[in-house]
Amino acid sequence: MNENLFASFAAPTILGLPAAVLIILFPPLLVPTSKHLINNRLITTQQWLIQLTSKQMMTMHSTKGRTWSLMLVSLIIFITTTNLLGLLPHSFTPTTQLSMNLAMAIPLWAGAVVMGFRFKTKNALAHFLPQGTPTPLIPMLVIIETISLLIQPMALAVRLTANITAGHLLMHLIGSATLALSTINLPYALIIFTILILLTILEIAVALIQAYVFTLLVSLYLHDNT
């Protein structure tokens, strides 16, 4: 019997209870904190990566916007570890669920927009009408800019969901082909297995890049509204 390609994206259960909550809370365990005065190599590397990421995203922010650095660093660590855990065999990737990605994107986007309208009302309203717009095009441009603003959280969530899901499906298909050919033609199976290894390396890069892109776009939304 052929396994459903999307079976790996179904939320698992433990004793009839959804295990998504436990899976989502698991990534923080992979980022340990040191209790010693002198850190080991793992903690030092972890802190260096966090500082590098924070500096990269906070350079364009004002002093007020830099208060969000802890939230942005926590966000990129969470998405990165969740994506990487999903590459393990027979595991579940929460970021393949559009509902979870929307639950991350909508509050962050809404918070940035509300801050913009509260503290930078004129600048926020000015985004709806570019300077020098011909008078007959004003109503149409206002509608277009409003729609583009409202679809920002959907674009954030769909981008992350689509990229992670597509990679997992491709790995599943190539892995199934490798198993099928292993009993028919071993040389071809080894070639496809090599392709699977290369694809796995590519998916690790995609997991890191998508976490960075998601967090960077949230940072840009905050920059435009703070």
Swiss-Prot record:
Any one GO MF annotation of this record: proton-transporting ATP synthase activity, rotational mechanism
Membrane-spanning segments: 6-26, 68-88, 97-117, 138-158, 164-184, 189-209
Keywords in alphabetical order: ATP synthesis, CF(0), Hydrogen ion transport, Ion transport, Membrane, Mitochondrion, Mitochondrion inner membrane, Transmembrane, Transmembrane helix, Transport
Membrane topology, from the record: Multi-pass membrane protein
InterPro entries in UniProt: ATP_synth_F0_asu, ATP_synth_F0_asu_AS, ATP_synth_F0_asu_bact/mt, F0_ATP_A_sf
GO cellular component term, pick one: proton-transporting ATP synthase complex
Keyword Membrane found: yes
Catalytic activity line of the entry: H(+)(in) = H(+)(out)
Main localization, broad class: mitochondrion
GO biological process: proton motive force-driven ATP synthesis; proton motive force-driven mitochondrial ATP synthesis; proton transmembrane transport
Localization in the cell: Mitochondrion inner membrane
Gene3D superfamilies attached to this UniProt entry: ATP synthase, F0 complex, subunit A (1.20.120.220)
Family, as annotated: Belongs to the ATPase A chain family.
Primary role: Subunit a, of the mitochondrial membrane ATP synthase complex (F(1)F(0) ATP synthase or Complex V) that produces ATP from ADP in the presence of a proton gradient across the membrane which is generated by electron transport complexes of the respiratory chain. ATP synthase complex consist of a soluble F(1) head domain - the catalytic core - and a membrane F(1) domain - the membrane proton channel. These two domains are linked by a central stalk rotating inside the F(1) region and a stationary peripheral stalk.
Quaternary structure and interacting proteins, as annotated: Component of the ATP synthase complex composed at least of ATP5F1A/subunit alpha, ATP5F1B/subunit beta, ATP5MC1/subunit c (homooctomer), MT-ATP6/subunit a, MT-ATP8/subunit 8, ATP5ME/subunit e, ATP5MF/subunit f, ATP5MG/subunit g, ATP5MK/subunit k, ATP5MJ/subunit j, ATP5F1C/subunit gamma, ATP5F1D/subunit delta, ATP5F1E/subunit epsilon, ATP5PF/subunit F6, ATP5PB/subunit b, ATP5PD/subunit d, ATP5PO/subunit OSCP.
Name of this protein: ATP synthase F(0) complex subunit a
Organism: Pan troglodytes (Chimpanzee)
